[in-house]
Amino acid sequence: SGKVEIELVQYKPEAVDIFEQFQDEFNATHDDIYLKIDSPNDAMTILKTRFIREDNPDIIGIGGDINYSNFLDADMLMDISDFEGLNDIKEKYLEMNKDLEYVPKDGVYAVPYMANAAGILFNRDMFEEHGWEIPTTWTEFTNLCDQIQSEGIQPLYFGFKDTWTTLAPWNAIAVSLCDSDLTYQVNSGKTTFAENYREVAEKEKALLTYGQK
């Protein structure tokens, strides 16, 4: 066909529909390029296997986690410093990319294209019905949970069906209590995770008393 085929493998199967939409829109507007987006269920295992076999996709869509750090450390990713689209990305997100490097490297190796928010969803109707005030501090939050529990209502519901969702409350607490460069401090021998995560773990444990059994 004479078209250049670009393969993108991304690791969020729950986002298949939107990525398929991106694929269709791109292909409809580019006559000389065919974009193929794969969203396999076990994407990370598949990616690691393909890297070992040197069957690398052109683009990968993964999170800013340890897998990204490992791929970067193994020199699996290409420097894209000359990509003009980087000018449209907030500097803070690019700095977060650099924070994921085990050893500081020159260049840019990822394009941040989305950000997640950690928070708590609440039933507004129930709050209005019971006269509960929206808490703004940890103490106000736990006091409210105690009050709700005393009224015979389960205060919290945790989405722990998948293991990764257990990180949501942990991350939200840790980012407020720990230094942003904690990993670097630990790697340089200045401190330990055990020392810094104790309060985080205690607060996470406290939350569990308000959730489902």
Question: How would you name each of these model-derived features?
Answer:
Residues 13-16, 42-44, 65-69, 116-119, ...:
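Solvent-exposed loop/turn segments at secondary-structure junctions
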Residues 1-7, 28-29, 105-107, 128, ...:
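Immediate post-signal peptide segment of exported/extracytoplasmic ligand-binding proteins
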Residues 31-33, 54-58, 107-108, 149-155, ...:
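Loop/turn elements at helix/coil->beta-strand transitions in domains of secreted/extracellular proteins
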Residues 63-118, 142, 168-171, 196:
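Hinge/lid segment of periplasmic solute-binding proteins
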Residues 25-93, 125, 129-130, 136:
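Extracytoplasmic "Venus flytrap"/periplasmic binding protein-like
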Residues 2-13, 33-38, 59, 109, ...:
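Short, well-ordered beta-strand elements
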